[in-house]
Amino acid sequence: MNFYNIFVFVALILAITIGQSEAGWLKKIGKKIERVGQHTRDATIQGLGIAQQAANVAATARG
């Protein structure tokens, strides 16, 4: 019974310390994923603008 209490205590301490140290690299990965999303959004908006301009040119060329 005493071993179980010690095991739970050690596991709890490890979980707390690992949880605090893991936040650094998880935050970096999250920022990288967020940046990829922003670049994708910006490229999509730019692509839509170019497509709209091409459609306008095509409509003008047809008369």
Curated annotation (Swiss-Prot):
Hemolymph (at protein level). Strongly expressed in larval, pupal and adult fat body and hemocytes after injection of bacteria. Maximal expression in the adult involves fat body cells of the head, thorax and abdomen. The keyword Secreted applies. Induction: By bacterial infection (at protein level). Induced as part of the humoral response to a bacterial invasion. Transcripts appear within one hour after injection of bacteria into the hemocoel, reach a maximum after 2-6 hours and have almost disappeared after 24 hours. Similar response is seen when flies ingest bacteria present in their food. 8 hours after bacterial infection of embryos (2-6 hours after hatching), up-regulated in the larval epidermis and 16 hour post-infection is up-regulated in the larval fat body. Cecropins have lytic and antibacterial activity against several Gram-positive and Gram-negative bacteria. Functions in the imd/NF-kappa-B (Imd) epithelial and humoral immune response to Gram-negative bacteria. Changing V8A: In strain: M26. It is found in: Secreted. GO terms for cellular component: extracellular region; extracellular space. Its main location: secreted. Keywords: Amidation, Antibiotic, Antimicrobial, Immunity, Innate immunity, Secreted, Signal. Changing A11P: In strain: B226 and B316. Residues 1-23 form the signal peptide. Pfam families: Cecropin. PANTHER family: CECROPIN-A1-RELATED (PTHR38329:SF1). Changing I45V: In strain: MJ1. It comes from Drosophila melanogaster (Fruit fly). This is Cecropin-A1. The modification Arginine amide is found at R62. Belongs to the cecropin family. GO terms for biological process: antibacterial humoral response; defense response to Gram-negative bacterium; defense response to Gram-positive bacterium; defense response to insect; defense response to virus; humoral immune response; innate immune response; response to bacterium. Changing L14V: In strain: MJ3.
